Design a protein with these regions (language model features):
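Short, contiguous clusters of charged residues that form electrostatic/catalytic patches at enzyme active sites
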Residues: 23, 27, 125-133, 154, ...
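Flexible, glycine/charged-enriched surface loops at secondary-structure junctions
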Residues: 67-68, 143
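N-terminal active-site beta-alpha-beta segment that forms phosphate/nucleotide-binding
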Residues: 73-76, 84, 88-209
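Short capping segments at the starts of secondary-structure elements
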Residues: 31-36
Length: 287
């Protein structure tokens, strides 16, 4: 398959571009459910004229249903998207990239979703869908699942369902609150996952960033001790990787720390660890 795609790129480069464009249109409409042409053109970064021409082709093939209310993918379109997914991953070069990352970091599996989740809500939605799909396959009976906060984990939570309710599973926050939107808090995401899967959940009502004295004081509370012990039993932990400076500002760190992170080349953050572009830890904050 990889060789066929390479040959096609050489002999029919225009065909490859057209295929990618129409796939992105169909995929975006499927994610949106029902969408207008102007809104879709804006989110895809193309003119309405170009989009109109492509929509006409997709409609004529029976892949789109167009009405006064907007556009939606037909049953035939959904089936086509499911069948073409592996081919498109090869076409975008994602399969090869997944394997390279898997080998480089010694991982069992890597899944890459096309698009820029920072710019496109459709890409963030697909990232959440992929995460929910993997989690469904990994969770076992009586598992404790720890989750952090953030927009990506919120998308995973909103799309997570089990084939049948599993009250034996428990979802818990893997960190405290960051003072962000309540929808993005770890507590909210844990409860959403539990409600959507028929599981249980526990909440942790403490801020993420604490001084040593405050931390030691909180750990004397029996209720806090109990939930922390449950969290430590988590077999699965799901976390996002945030922008270093954005996460530092959410923790309301002082300007000198922000400046130090910039000087150290901090690019990403997870669980209070700040990493440079090469993956080296350049700073640590207690969480």
């Amino acid at each position: 398959m990889r060789r066929i795609i390479d040959i096609q790129k050489q002999l029919l480069p225009d065909m490859t571009d057209t295929l990618k464009r129409r796939y992105n249109i169909l995929k975006s409409i499927k994610v949106s459910g029902m969408v207008g042409r102007r809104s879709l053109a804006s989110s895809l970064g193309m003119t309405e004229r170009v989009l109109r021409a492509e929509v006409d082709v997709l409609k004529s093939q029976g892949l789109l249903d167009v009405s006064v209310g907007g556009m939606q993918v037909s049953d035939a379109g959904r089936q086509l998207l499911d069948e073409i997914e592996p081919i498109m991953k090869d076409l975008f070069g994602l399969t090869e990239m997944e394997e390279s990352i898997r080998i480089a970091y010694g991982l069992q599996q890597v899944i890459i979703v096309p698009g820029d989740s920072e710019q496109s809500p459709h890409s963030k939605h697909e990232l959440g869908r992929a995460g929910a799909h993997v989690l469904r396959k990994c969770v076992k009976k009586h598992d404790v699942v720890g989750v952090t906060g953030g927009s990506t984990l919120a998308e995973v939570a909103n799309q997570l369902t089990f084939s049948s309710p599993d009250p034996s599973c428990m979802f818990v926050p893997a960190r405290g609150g960051l003072g962000e939107n309540v929808e993005l808090q770890a507590n909210t995401i844990a409860s959403t996952m539990a409600k959507r899967t028929g599981g249980q959940y526990r909440l942790l009502h403490v801020p993420d960033h604490l001084g040593e004295e405050a931390y030691q004081s909180l750990m004397l509370d029996p209720n806090i001790q109990e939930i922390v012990e449950v969290i430590r039993r988590a077999r699965i932990v799901i976390h996002g990787i945030g922008n270093a400076l954005t996460m530092a500002r959410r923790r309301k760190v002082d300007s000198s720390t922000i400046e130090r992170l910039q000087q150290e080349g901090a690019h990403a953050e997870a669980f209070g660890y700040y990493f440079d572009r090469a993956g080296n830890v350049v700073h640590k904050m207690p969480t």
